[in-house]
């Protein structure tokens, strides 16, 4: 097209213009090149003259400098070789130590495997005991069901007794005459009941004392049982005096109620005993965990501990079997008593009709019982003697308790003396630590003074160096001038070569442009329409190239102008250099003298610096030794503090025991005082009984006349009895409801107790699982600690290397002083940590020695040692793989620690729930006590009514009285058998309670051990992290020192190369100077 042709024409014109400009530039360039050649020849002549004169001066100076640098470098090379040899020796020692540690690790791993096997056995035994505990809880649930059945039967009996009471209440109006005598007897019965309750309280106190003083408590129990038997005999005699079979039946009912209430109380006590047994169980579990820790430290003792645990488990199994047998016997006894009570109920219903006939026979027995009462009074005197004997026994108990109190006080005084001694040791250690800190401060002050002196020396050396530099400036000015002239020459040569290269590049560009133009022409002719856009781009590129060419031409012109200027400047400088050469010859002689004097001063200052450096090192060693002593003192102080804490705990325990003993003594004194009161009351009762007997004789004669009237009034009473029976039925219904409520509340408390037991068992299983996990974590942590110790030893070797490199850096370079101070601080910190680790290592080595001695004693382990020697090679490979796995295991340990924390939180929430349940149980027990008091009040009301009814019934027939007396005797025998069975059942239940308390205590101790292990794992993790950080810092420092060493080595090699090049140049310049000198002589 036309446009492309125009553009091509324009391009051709521009190309021709550029060709012309290039031709002009080439012509100018040729002229400049010719001028440059002439100038270069002149310059070379001048340089040869200047170099010939200046080289003679520079050669001597360079030789001196090179000799000094060579000596210094040789000394450094020697030091580096010596360090390398020391490092090799250290590496060899470390490899030997590593092998020893690997051997020890393999032995410890095998011991740990043995311990794990024993732990697995112990866990199996624990599971077996837990299953036994579950079986016992099921049996307890069965017993609770039987108790519920017995309560139901008791309600039925109460209903029957209430019916009989309703029948008797019909005759209340007819027995007003005997109320006075009966009220007196009731007062006596109430007093005896109060004494009985006091005796029960005393018995409970004695049972508490039984846990600490079993022998004394047995005697007290025997005396209390004798007193109870005496009281029962007194009750029986008082019942005979009353001559009322209905009263006797009512008393038996009351006794049944009281026994049931006692059973409720005993069940509550059993629940408390089970809680105590749980606490004991947790204690035992904590003891077992402690034994496991001791097993990990002493391998041989672990075997003995496991055998002892197996024996303990066997004993526990035997105890559980005994408890099962006791429970089965108790259930059989309860069933037998239930059947007997049913029979009694049937017999009592049949015999109620015959009671009216028996009442008439009472009159004849009254005269017989008159003589019997006198005998009973004599028996009461005998009982008083037995009470006095019991008092003597209790006084003996008090004496023994006082002796124990005195012993406890002596122990307390000993502990107090120990505490005072420990406090004195603590004060002494404080003073020693203060002295050590003061000595450390003094040493630090010495070090600071020495460092200041060193800084002053370095400042003086720097001042001398400045003087040298100022004096050598004049000397070096000439050398710089010569070097600048040489550099200018080199620059001119380089510029000339660059211009030639630029010319060649322009020619190449021109040829490329021509070829591209021809190509574009051919392409334009063929593809003119299609390639318009490509032509435009090519046009732009050509325009840019033309601009670049123009700029290059301008740059060449500017260089030519600068070359002319440099030519004139060089001519002026050559004239100045000739003058300076003459001056430098004069100053050389002066500088030689000054340099000799300066060398002497330098040698003196170097000697002083070395002395100060030696003093510094000695002070550092002293400070390190002092720091180690301070660390040891701190360890001793911490140990003394731990001992103090243990003594304080023991003191607290002793104080608690003393308080318990004082309470027991006070309670025993109260008991003695109460017994004296009882004695006085019995004397009063004796006199009152005699008076009552006389009144009863008079009243009986008066009542014989009234018996006839009573028979007439009986018919009237029957109608009233029917009316009252309906009222009593309503009261019975109310009592039934109250009893049902009580039974339901008891059942709910028992269900809650069973749930708490199941929860405790679940928690126990969880804690055992957590224990196993924590033991595994401990093993991992021990392995990591061993590896950290190895890394620390490696860091010790690296530390020594870094210390040597730092010393070299201090001598060689002033710039690295600040880095040296930082490194020294780090080194001190590392050394302190290393010393701590050494202390821990020494402790581990002591434990290892103990284990080795135990291993030598054990014949079985000797055979294992032979197999261990063969497996050491395999364990070495395993250790290398374990190192790679440790990081993963650390993450697992962290995760497990978090899981353990969550489990601990759950356990805390469970404990809070248990506390709430305990509060609920306490509330229910308080409610039961209130119910008990209400029941006692109702019983007293019923007794009053019974007494009145009995007074009315005295006017009945004698036959009924005889039958009722026989019935009363049978019931008394049955009651005695029932009481014996109840005592045996109570003993079995108390054993169960103790066992449950022990188990709960073991679970609590296990939870504490788990928390302690978790704290241990956290501490180990923090230590491992600190060791990792220290190792990384040491590696970084070693890498920095290695890089510095490599730089120094590289600089040394470069300096040697420069010295060789300088020597070769000096030789060349000498040859050239000789040639120039010979030419000058020939021209002259």
UniProtKB/Swiss-Prot annotation:
Chain positions covered by the region annotation Disordered: 1-20, 270-292, 298-317
Top-level taxon in the UniProt lineage: Eukaryota
Segments of skewed composition (Basic and acidic residues): 273-292
Role noted for this protein: Muscle contraction.
Protein name as annotated: Myosin heavy chain, skeletal muscle
Membrane spanning residue stretches: none
Subunit structure: Muscle myosin is a hexameric protein that consists of 2 heavy chain subunits (MHC), 2 alkali light chain subunits (MLC) and 2 regulatory light chain subunits (MLC-2).
Any one GO BP annotation for this protein: actin filament-based movement
Region described as Alpha-helical tailpiece (S2): 1-258
Presence of keyword Coiled coil: yes
Alphabetic keyword roster: Actin-binding, ATP-binding, Coiled coil, Cytoplasm, Motor protein, Muscle protein, Myosin, Nucleotide-binding, Thick filament
Record region (Rodlike tail (S2 and LMM domains)): 259-1084
Comment text on domains: The rodlike tail sequence is highly repetitive, showing cycles of a 28-residue repeat pattern composed of 4 heptapeptides, characteristic for alpha-helical coiled coils.
Localization (cell): Cytoplasm, Myofibril
Main subcellular localisation: cytoplasm
GO terms for cellular component: myofibril; myosin complex; myosin filament; myosin II complex
Annotated Pfam families: Myosin_tail_1
Coiled-coil segments: 455-1084
Molecular-function GO term, any one: actin filament binding
Highest classification ranks of the organism: Eukaryota, Metazoa, Chordata, Craniata, Vertebrata
Statement: the UniProt record of this protein carries the keyword ATP-binding: yes
